[in-house]
C-alpha cells in the first residue's frame, strides 16, 4: 500500500479530528521511553495545540484517501537551525523510506533544517535506517 504524507490545513482540523484522534491518543499512551506525556498534556491539549497552529498536523493516506496514521510536529528556532520536533506519531506514518522522504519535504518547505523526536527502542532502530542518530538521554526532576 502506498501512503501519502500530507499536512492538514488548520481550517480542516475539526472535520478530520474524529478520524485521527485515536492515532494521537495511542501515541500519547504508548510507553515510548520518553517522559510520561500524560503528565504534560492530554488529547484535549493536543487538539488545542493543533487548532491554534502551535503544532502542525500530518496524516498518512492511501490511494482511497483513507487515513492510516497521524503525527504532530512543533518547530523551534535556534541561532543556527530550525528544528522540527515530532511531538506525537501514531498508526502507520513514517514506516518506509518513501514516507520519510515525504515528511522531510514537508518539513523543509516549512523552513526546518533538522528533524528530531523521542522514540522507544523499536522506533530508534527503524528511524536509524532513515539517517537518525541517538543524540542524548533526557533526564528530568520534578521541582
Feature names for model-found ranges:
Residues 15-26, 48, 105, 125, ...:
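Charged/polar, solvent-exposed surface patches and flexible loops
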Residues 118, 133-143:
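Conserved catalytic-core motifs of GNAT/GCN5-like acyltransferases
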Residues 1-40:
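Short amphipathic alpha-helix that is part of the acyltransferase structural core
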Residues 54-55, 129-133:
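Short glycine-aromatic motifs
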Residues 34-54:
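Active-site rim helix/loop that mediates acceptor-substrate recognition in acyltransferases
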Residues 81-130:
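Acyl-donor binding region in acyl/amide transferases
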